[in-house]
């Protein structure tokens, strides 16, 4: 989940490229503007042939309000905040930061050119969600992407192992 222009598509493309040899990945575009949309997304996930997919990714169209308000059935939520958006997003959209488990702070390669305080942003996020995994990345240059991929692989493997045993998190 993220705002338009935060780097969802680039991050998603690089993520799939890095994981495609180890995991079978499905992607669903999800425009969550209402409970009806969330219900349709959840139904789509239920109808997905899970025997063919290890990881299903829901990519929202790009806003920080609606996706946080509705349960899509996602096991984990990750969001992308880009440096050009500003370090005050946690103050403006607290719910989004409360419902996610992982935050990618993207476009760190342009940090020197923006008034973005990375440490202050992290403090604001952790005040809202002390358990948030925060990973600074540049999807364009690849910086930080290994940490993101490792986290996602671990979470995916852990869930798949639990699911095979009939355990729901």
Sequence positions of predicted segments:
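Nucleotide-state-sensitive switch-loop elements of NTP-binding domains
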Residues: 1, 6-73, 86-88, 97
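Residues at alpha-helix caps and immediate loop-helix transition turns in enzyme cores, especially N-
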Residues: 11, 37, 89-92, 117, ...
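Hydrophobic transmembrane alpha-helix bundles
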Residues: 35-36, 91-101, 150, 169
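Conserved C-terminal guanine-recognition region of P-loop GTPase G domains, centered on the G4
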Residues: 64-76, 80-132
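Canonical P-loop GTPase G-domain recognition
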Residues: 110-169
């Amino acid at each position: 989940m993220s705002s338009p222009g935060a780097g969802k598509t680039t991050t998603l493309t690089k993520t799939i490229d890095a994981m495609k040899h180890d995991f079978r990945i499905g992607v669903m575009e999800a425009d969550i503007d209402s409970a009806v949309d969330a219900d349709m997304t959840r139904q789509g996930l239920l109808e997905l042939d899970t025997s063919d997919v290890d990881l299903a990714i829901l990519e929202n169209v790009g806003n920080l309000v609606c996706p946080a308000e509705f349960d899509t059935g996602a096991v984990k939520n990750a969001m992308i905040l880009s440096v050009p958006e500003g370090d005050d997003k946690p103050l403006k959209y607290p719910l989004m930061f409360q419902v996610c488990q992982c935050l990618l702070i993207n476009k760190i390669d342009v940090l020197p050119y923006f008034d973005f305080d990375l440490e202050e942003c992290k403090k604001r996020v952790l005040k809202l969600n002390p358990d948030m995994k925060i990973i600074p990345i540049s999807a364009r240059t690849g910086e930080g992407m290994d940490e993101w991929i490792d986290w996602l692989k671990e979470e995916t493997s852990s869930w798949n192992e639990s699911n095979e045993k009939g355990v729901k998190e």
